[in-house]
């Protein structure tokens, strides 16, 4: 099966995908302009308004509004101008998608990165993989959950019990 080729303009390579080790079945990222559609991701989103390639051009706000608020704010404040320059926007923020016709919902892929997927023996009812990130409110809530249930759950991650292939 042939893959659909996107020109990817992103600060990350997204290799093999936007979810680390989960290789896309239908998409191939092209970093040299050989694809059929241009996709400007998160921190490169504003570069899309200067695209003169003539190819369909989209912005993908892959990160949440809490992580890249300045890009969401600029795009939404200048929505009519941005939409006059591109073909559409993808976002994982449902409230933004409901409010703006040109913004489509695109779920952020958070598939597990576990290489050897199986059901492992547990010492407690629930296990959780968590990081110590504190970049937004959701991160803080996760860490509050960790503190509250520290003795009732098995925690894994860089800070707790590091695993090499999460």
What is each residue range found by the language model?
Residues 1-166:
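Nucleotide-sugar donor-binding catalytic core of glycosyltransferases
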């Amino acid at each position: 099966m042939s893959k659909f080729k996107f020109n990817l303009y992103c600060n990350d390579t997204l290799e093999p995908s936007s979810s680390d080790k989960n290789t896309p079945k239908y998409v191939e990222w092209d970093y040299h302009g050989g694809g059929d559609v241009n996709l400007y991701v998160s921190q490169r989103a504003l570069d899309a308004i200067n695209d003169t390639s003539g190819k369909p051009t989209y912005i993908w706000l892959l990160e949440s509004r809490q992580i890249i608020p300045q890009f969401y704010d600029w795009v939404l404040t200048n929505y009519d101008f941005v939409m006059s320059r591109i073909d559409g926007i993808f976002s994982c923020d449902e409230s933004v998608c409901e409010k703006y016709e040109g913004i489509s919902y695109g779920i952020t892929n958070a598939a597990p990165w576990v290489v050897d997927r199986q059901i492992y023996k547990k010492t407690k009812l629930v296990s959780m993989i968590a990081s110590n990130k504190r970049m937004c409110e959701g991160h803080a809530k996760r860490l509050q959950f960790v503190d509250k249930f520290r003795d009732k759950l098995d925690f894994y991650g860089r800070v707790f019990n590091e695993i090499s292939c999460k």
